[in-house]
Amino acid sequence: MNKLVYSALAITLCSVPGIASDNWSSLDQELNSLSASLQAQNQGGPKLGGWLRSAFRSSSDLQTGGSDIQGFELNDARIEITGDAGNTYSYKISFGVETGTAVLKDAYAKWEIANGVNGKMGRYKVAFFQSSLIPESRLLFIHRSALGDIFSSRDEGFEISGEFEQIQYQVGVQNGTDGQGDEYRFTARVRADLMGNGTGKTEGAYGSGDETNLSAAVAWQDEGSLDDGMVLGAEVQMTSGPFSVAGEAADFDEGTAGAFGITNGILDQWGIVGGDVADTTPWGVTGSYMFTDMYEAAVRYEDADDTEDTTSIRVAVNRYVAGHDIKWTVEWQTVDTDNAIDDFDVLGLGLALSF
Protein backbone atom coordinates (compact mmCIF):
# COMPACT_ATOMS: atom_id res chain seq x y z
CA MET A 1 0.00 0.00 0.00
CA ASN A 2 2.79 2.35 0.96
CA LYS A 3 4.54 1.49 -2.28
CA LEU A 4 1.43 2.53 -4.21
CA VAL A 5 1.19 5.85 -2.32
CA TYR A 6 4.87 6.61 -2.82
CA SER A 7 4.61 5.75 -6.49
CA ALA A 8 1.59 8.06 -6.94
CA LEU A 9 3.38 10.91 -5.17
CA ALA A 10 6.47 10.41 -7.30
CA ILE A 11 4.43 10.46 -10.52
CA THR A 12 2.60 13.63 -9.37
CA LEU A 13 5.81 15.42 -8.43
CA CYS A 14 7.43 14.50 -11.72
CA SER A 15 4.43 15.72 -13.74
CA VAL A 16 4.14 19.14 -12.00
CA PRO A 17 7.34 20.59 -13.55
CA GLY A 18 6.13 19.46 -16.95
CA ILE A 19 2.77 21.21 -16.47
CA ALA A 20 4.46 24.30 -15.02
CA SER A 21 6.91 24.30 -17.91
CA ASP A 22 4.04 24.27 -20.40
CA ASN A 23 2.26 27.07 -18.51
CA TRP A 24 5.39 29.24 -18.35
CA SER A 25 6.07 28.61 -22.03
CA SER A 26 2.53 29.71 -22.88
CA LEU A 27 2.90 32.79 -20.66
CA ASP A 28 6.20 33.68 -22.33
CA GLN A 29 4.55 33.47 -25.73
CA GLU A 30 1.71 35.73 -24.60
CA LEU A 31 4.15 38.27 -23.13
CA ASN A 32 6.25 38.25 -26.30
CA SER A 33 3.11 38.74 -28.39
CA LEU A 34 2.00 41.64 -26.17
CA SER A 35 5.46 43.21 -26.35
CA ALA A 36 5.47 42.97 -30.15
CA SER A 37 1.99 44.49 -30.28
CA LEU A 38 3.04 47.41 -28.07
CA GLN A 39 6.16 47.96 -30.15
CA ALA A 40 4.04 48.06 -33.30
CA GLN A 41 1.71 50.59 -31.67
CA ASN A 42 4.65 52.73 -30.58
CA GLN A 43 6.08 52.66 -34.10
CA GLY A 44 2.91 53.43 -36.03
CA GLY A 45 0.56 55.04 -33.52
CA PRO A 46 0.17 58.70 -32.56
CA LYS A 47 3.12 60.40 -30.89
CA LEU A 48 2.59 63.36 -28.58
CA GLY A 49 5.09 66.21 -28.30
CA GLY A 50 5.34 69.96 -28.05
CA TRP A 51 6.98 72.77 -26.16
CA LEU A 52 6.45 75.62 -23.69
CA ARG A 53 8.06 79.06 -23.95
CA SER A 54 7.59 81.88 -21.47
CA ALA A 55 9.48 85.09 -20.78
CA PHE A 56 9.80 88.14 -18.53
CA ARG A 57 9.97 91.46 -20.41
CA SER A 58 11.00 94.90 -19.19
CA SER A 59 10.95 98.22 -21.08
CA SER A 60 10.64 101.82 -19.93
CA ASP A 61 9.91 102.87 -23.53
CA LEU A 62 6.95 100.60 -24.36
CA GLN A 63 3.72 100.61 -22.42
CA THR A 64 0.75 98.38 -21.83
CA GLY A 65 -2.42 99.69 -20.19
CA GLY A 66 -0.73 103.03 -19.49
CA SER A 67 2.18 101.46 -17.58
CA ASP A 68 5.71 100.53 -18.62
CA ILE A 69 6.11 96.93 -19.75
CA GLN A 70 7.48 94.89 -16.86
CA GLY A 71 5.85 91.51 -16.61
CA PHE A 72 5.57 87.93 -17.76
CA GLU A 73 4.28 86.51 -21.03
CA LEU A 74 3.48 83.07 -22.37
CA ASN A 75 5.00 82.91 -25.84
CA ASP A 76 4.02 79.36 -26.81
CA ALA A 77 2.19 76.38 -25.39
CA ARG A 78 2.31 73.96 -28.30
CA ILE A 79 0.89 70.44 -28.55
CA GLU A 80 1.81 68.28 -31.55
CA ILE A 81 0.40 64.91 -32.58
CA THR A 82 2.24 63.00 -35.30
CA GLY A 83 2.12 59.46 -36.60
CA ASP A 84 2.21 56.98 -39.47
CA ALA A 85 -1.08 55.90 -41.01
CA GLY A 86 0.47 53.16 -43.15
CA ASN A 87 1.19 52.79 -46.87
CA THR A 88 3.74 55.70 -46.71
CA TYR A 89 1.08 58.07 -45.34
CA SER A 90 1.75 60.13 -42.21
CA TYR A 91 0.05 63.02 -40.46
CA LYS A 92 0.62 65.97 -38.17
CA ILE A 93 -1.87 67.95 -36.08
CA SER A 94 -0.76 70.76 -33.77
CA PHE A 95 -2.45 73.30 -31.53
CA GLY A 96 -1.36 76.47 -29.78
CA VAL A 97 -3.06 76.88 -26.39
CA GLU A 98 -1.12 79.85 -24.99
CA THR A 99 -4.20 82.11 -25.24
CA GLY A 100 -6.30 79.75 -23.12
CA THR A 101 -8.17 78.53 -26.20
CA ALA A 102 -6.91 75.85 -28.57
CA VAL A 103 -5.94 77.37 -31.93
CA LEU A 104 -5.26 75.01 -34.83
CA LYS A 105 -1.75 75.36 -36.28
CA ASP A 106 -0.91 72.39 -38.50
CA ALA A 107 -3.28 69.76 -39.82
CA TYR A 108 -1.97 67.88 -42.84
CA ALA A 109 -1.33 64.49 -44.36
CA LYS A 110 1.94 63.62 -46.08
CA TRP A 111 2.66 60.72 -48.40
CA GLU A 112 5.19 59.38 -50.88
CA ILE A 113 4.32 60.10 -54.52
CA ALA A 114 7.47 58.49 -55.92
CA ASN A 115 10.95 57.65 -54.67
CA GLY A 116 12.26 60.86 -53.10
CA VAL A 117 9.10 62.85 -53.93
CA ASN A 118 6.45 63.60 -51.29
CA GLY A 119 3.02 65.20 -51.29
CA LYS A 120 1.44 67.24 -48.51
CA MET A 121 -2.17 68.39 -48.25
CA GLY A 122 -4.03 70.27 -45.53
CA ARG A 123 -3.04 73.22 -43.36
CA TYR A 124 0.70 73.83 -43.18
CA LYS A 125 3.37 76.53 -42.99
CA VAL A 126 4.54 78.07 -46.24
CA ALA A 127 8.08 77.00 -47.23
CA PHE A 128 9.93 80.26 -47.87
CA PHE A 129 12.67 81.04 -45.32
CA GLN A 130 14.53 78.62 -43.04
CA SER A 131 14.04 81.11 -40.20
CA SER A 132 10.27 80.63 -40.50
CA LEU A 133 10.38 76.82 -40.78
CA ILE A 134 12.54 76.34 -37.65
CA PRO A 135 10.36 75.48 -34.62
CA GLU A 136 10.08 78.25 -32.00
CA SER A 137 11.77 75.95 -29.49
CA ARG A 138 14.95 75.89 -31.63
CA LEU A 139 15.52 79.66 -31.93
CA LEU A 140 18.55 81.66 -30.76
CA PHE A 141 16.38 84.52 -29.55
CA ILE A 142 13.03 84.80 -27.79
CA HIS A 143 11.42 85.96 -31.05
CA ARG A 144 11.97 84.89 -34.65
CA SER A 145 13.68 87.22 -37.06
CA ALA A 146 11.34 89.83 -38.55
CA LEU A 147 11.31 88.06 -41.93
CA GLY A 148 10.93 84.69 -40.24
CA ASP A 149 7.83 86.04 -38.51
CA ILE A 150 6.32 87.41 -41.72
CA PHE A 151 6.63 84.06 -43.52
CA SER A 152 5.62 81.80 -40.60
CA SER A 153 1.91 81.94 -41.41
CA ARG A 154 -0.07 78.80 -42.24
CA ASP A 155 -2.73 78.20 -44.87
CA GLU A 156 -4.63 75.37 -46.53
CA GLY A 157 -3.09 73.98 -49.69
CA PHE A 158 -1.07 71.32 -51.47
CA GLU A 159 2.72 70.96 -51.67
CA ILE A 160 5.19 68.73 -53.48
CA SER A 161 8.63 68.33 -51.94
CA GLY A 162 11.67 66.20 -52.53
CA GLU A 163 15.42 66.03 -52.65
CA PHE A 164 18.13 65.01 -55.07
CA GLU A 165 21.55 64.48 -53.49
CA GLN A 166 22.34 67.88 -51.86
CA ILE A 167 19.31 69.68 -53.34
CA GLN A 168 15.92 70.00 -51.61
CA TYR A 169 12.85 71.66 -53.09
CA GLN A 170 9.26 72.58 -52.25
CA VAL A 171 6.56 73.74 -54.67
CA GLY A 172 3.13 74.57 -53.32
CA VAL A 173 -0.22 76.26 -53.87
CA GLN A 174 -2.33 77.65 -51.02
CA ASN A 175 -5.61 79.55 -50.74
CA GLY A 176 -3.96 82.93 -50.13
CA THR A 177 -5.53 86.11 -48.79
CA ASP A 178 -8.87 85.60 -50.56
CA GLY A 179 -9.54 82.33 -48.72
CA GLN A 180 -11.37 79.84 -50.92
CA GLY A 181 -11.68 82.37 -53.72
CA ASP A 182 -10.32 81.68 -57.18
CA GLU A 183 -6.93 83.34 -56.61
CA TYR A 184 -4.03 81.38 -55.10
CA ARG A 185 -0.70 81.91 -53.40
CA PHE A 186 2.04 80.02 -55.24
CA THR A 187 5.40 79.32 -53.58
CA ALA A 188 8.60 77.63 -54.74
CA ARG A 189 11.84 77.10 -52.84
CA VAL A 190 15.16 75.44 -53.70
CA ARG A 191 17.80 74.81 -51.03
CA ALA A 192 21.28 73.36 -51.50
CA ASP A 193 23.75 71.94 -48.98
CA LEU A 194 27.00 73.38 -50.34
CA MET A 195 29.43 72.17 -47.66
CA GLY A 196 29.39 69.34 -45.15
CA ASN A 197 25.95 68.03 -44.25
CA GLY A 198 24.30 71.43 -44.55
CA THR A 199 22.61 73.23 -41.67
CA GLY A 200 19.55 71.77 -39.98
CA LYS A 201 16.35 73.19 -38.52
CA THR A 202 18.14 74.81 -35.58
CA GLU A 203 19.48 78.34 -35.24
CA GLY A 204 23.05 78.80 -34.06
CA ALA A 205 26.03 76.49 -33.66
CA TYR A 206 24.79 74.17 -30.91
CA GLY A 207 24.98 70.53 -32.00
CA SER A 208 26.36 71.35 -35.46
CA GLY A 209 29.65 69.46 -35.02
CA ASP A 210 33.22 70.51 -35.75
CA GLU A 211 33.09 70.51 -39.55
CA THR A 212 31.99 73.42 -41.71
CA ASN A 213 28.39 73.21 -42.95
CA LEU A 214 26.97 75.62 -45.52
CA SER A 215 23.46 75.85 -46.98
CA ALA A 216 21.83 78.42 -49.26
CA ALA A 217 18.34 78.82 -50.68
CA VAL A 218 16.27 80.97 -53.00
CA ALA A 219 12.49 81.31 -52.85
CA TRP A 220 9.68 82.78 -54.93
CA GLN A 221 6.10 83.58 -53.98
CA ASP A 222 3.20 85.16 -55.85
CA GLU A 223 -0.02 86.26 -54.14
CA GLY A 224 -2.61 86.05 -56.91
CA SER A 225 -5.14 88.32 -55.22
CA LEU A 226 -2.68 91.26 -55.44
CA ASP A 227 -1.92 93.16 -58.64
CA ASP A 228 1.83 92.95 -58.06
CA GLY A 229 2.10 90.32 -55.35
CA MET A 230 5.46 88.72 -56.05
CA VAL A 231 8.17 88.23 -53.40
CA LEU A 232 11.71 86.99 -53.97
CA GLY A 233 13.87 85.65 -51.15
CA ALA A 234 17.47 84.57 -50.65
CA GLU A 235 19.20 83.15 -47.58
CA VAL A 236 22.40 81.50 -46.42
CA GLN A 237 23.39 79.67 -43.21
CA MET A 238 26.81 78.43 -42.13
CA THR A 239 28.22 76.70 -39.06
CA SER A 240 31.88 76.00 -38.37
CA GLY A 241 32.75 74.52 -35.00
CA PRO A 242 31.56 77.00 -32.34
CA PHE A 243 30.65 79.70 -34.90
CA SER A 244 27.49 80.27 -36.90
CA VAL A 245 26.35 82.97 -39.31
CA ALA A 246 23.11 83.42 -41.25
CA GLY A 247 21.66 86.03 -43.56
CA GLU A 248 18.32 86.55 -45.30
CA ALA A 249 16.70 89.14 -47.57
CA ALA A 250 13.32 89.52 -49.28
CA ASP A 251 12.25 91.78 -52.13
CA PHE A 252 8.55 92.71 -52.10
CA ASP A 253 6.72 93.88 -55.21
CA GLU A 254 4.39 96.93 -55.16
CA GLY A 255 1.28 95.01 -54.12
CA THR A 256 -2.12 96.53 -54.87
CA ALA A 257 -2.08 100.34 -54.82
CA GLY A 258 1.20 100.20 -52.92
CA ALA A 259 0.01 97.80 -50.21
CA PHE A 260 0.76 94.14 -49.46
CA GLY A 261 -1.37 93.98 -46.34
CA ILE A 262 1.75 93.10 -44.29
CA THR A 263 3.31 95.65 -41.95
CA ASN A 264 6.91 96.19 -40.85
CA GLY A 265 8.03 92.91 -39.28
CA ILE A 266 10.32 94.48 -36.65
CA LEU A 267 7.57 96.69 -35.21
CA ASP A 268 4.78 94.15 -35.72
CA GLN A 269 6.43 91.79 -33.21
CA TRP A 270 5.60 94.40 -30.54
CA GLY A 271 2.08 95.13 -31.76
CA ILE A 272 3.16 98.43 -33.32
CA VAL A 273 1.66 99.35 -36.70
CA GLY A 274 4.39 100.35 -39.11
CA GLY A 275 4.51 100.94 -42.84
CA ASP A 276 3.46 98.33 -45.39
CA VAL A 277 6.19 96.05 -46.78
CA ALA A 278 5.25 96.85 -50.39
CA ASP A 279 8.22 97.90 -52.54
CA THR A 280 10.77 97.24 -49.76
CA THR A 281 13.78 94.94 -49.43
CA PRO A 282 14.15 94.07 -45.73
CA TRP A 283 17.17 92.02 -44.67
CA GLY A 284 18.92 90.68 -41.61
CA VAL A 285 22.13 88.95 -40.50
CA THR A 286 22.77 86.79 -37.42
CA GLY A 287 25.97 85.51 -35.85
CA SER A 288 26.68 83.35 -32.81
CA TYR A 289 29.57 81.83 -30.89
CA MET A 290 29.56 78.99 -28.35
CA PHE A 291 32.11 79.96 -25.72
CA THR A 292 31.45 76.78 -23.69
CA ASP A 293 29.45 73.60 -24.31
CA MET A 294 26.51 75.13 -22.41
CA TYR A 295 26.61 78.81 -23.39
CA GLU A 296 26.11 80.49 -26.76
CA ALA A 297 26.21 84.24 -27.42
CA ALA A 298 24.34 85.69 -30.41
CA VAL A 299 23.79 89.02 -32.14
CA ARG A 300 21.28 89.95 -34.86
CA TYR A 301 20.98 93.08 -37.00
CA GLU A 302 17.86 93.78 -39.09
CA ASP A 303 16.92 96.57 -41.49
CA ALA A 304 13.27 96.95 -42.54
CA ASP A 305 14.15 99.18 -45.53
CA ASP A 306 10.99 101.18 -44.83
CA THR A 307 10.17 104.90 -45.01
CA GLU A 308 10.52 105.07 -41.21
CA ASP A 309 14.15 103.86 -41.33
CA THR A 310 13.49 101.05 -38.85
CA THR A 311 16.45 98.97 -37.69
CA SER A 312 16.88 96.49 -34.84
CA ILE A 313 19.81 95.02 -32.90
CA ARG A 314 19.38 91.99 -30.65
CA VAL A 315 22.01 90.54 -28.32
CA ALA A 316 21.38 87.29 -26.47
CA VAL A 317 23.06 84.57 -24.41
CA ASN A 318 21.62 81.05 -24.29
CA ARG A 319 22.26 78.68 -21.41
CA TYR A 320 21.61 75.09 -22.57
CA VAL A 321 20.46 72.85 -19.73
CA ALA A 322 19.58 69.98 -22.10
CA GLY A 323 20.34 71.45 -25.51
CA HIS A 324 17.42 73.28 -27.10
CA ASP A 325 15.03 70.99 -25.20
CA ILE A 326 15.64 72.96 -22.00
CA LYS A 327 17.30 76.36 -22.27
CA TRP A 328 17.36 79.85 -20.77
CA THR A 329 17.77 82.98 -22.90
CA VAL A 330 18.81 86.44 -21.74
CA GLU A 331 18.15 89.06 -24.43
CA TRP A 332 18.41 92.79 -25.09
CA GLN A 333 16.88 94.50 -28.12
CA THR A 334 17.17 98.09 -29.28
CA VAL A 335 15.00 99.45 -32.10
CA ASP A 336 15.71 102.70 -33.95
CA THR A 337 12.72 104.05 -35.90
CA ASP A 338 11.06 107.25 -37.09
CA ASN A 339 7.68 105.71 -36.26
CA ALA A 340 5.48 107.68 -33.85
CA ILE A 341 6.39 105.17 -31.13
CA ASP A 342 10.01 106.41 -31.40
CA ASP A 343 13.10 104.40 -30.42
CA PHE A 344 12.80 101.74 -27.71
CA ASP A 345 14.82 99.13 -25.79
CA VAL A 346 13.56 95.85 -24.31
CA LEU A 347 15.16 93.40 -21.87
CA GLY A 348 14.00 89.80 -21.71
CA LEU A 349 14.57 86.53 -19.87
CA GLY A 350 13.07 83.47 -21.53
CA LEU A 351 12.70 79.76 -20.75
CA ALA A 352 12.00 77.12 -23.40
CA LEU A 353 11.14 73.48 -22.64
CA SER A 354 10.33 70.76 -25.18
CA PHE A 355 8.68 67.42 -24.46
Task: State where each predicted segment sits.
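N-terminal periplasmic/intermembrane-space "pro-region" immediately following the signal or transit peptide
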Residues: 2-53, 165, 200, 355
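Outer membrane beta-barrel
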Residues: 34-197, 204-210, 283-307, 311-313
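Extracytoplasmic loops and strand-loop junctions of Gram-negative outer membrane beta-barrel proteins
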Residues: 61-64, 139-144, 217-220, 266-271, ...
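Outer-membrane beta-barrel and related beta-rich outer-membrane complex signature
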Residues: 62, 133-135, 257-261, 342
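A generic beta-sheet turn/junction motif
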Residues: 114, 162-166, 238-242, 319-323, ...
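Outer-membrane beta-barrel "beta-signal"
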Residues: 186-197, 319-321, 326, 343-355
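Detector for outer-membrane/organellar transmembrane beta-barrel domains
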Residues: 189-306, 311
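Conserved active-site loop/cleft motifs that coordinate metal ions or position small ligands
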Residues: 297-300, 316-318, 325-333
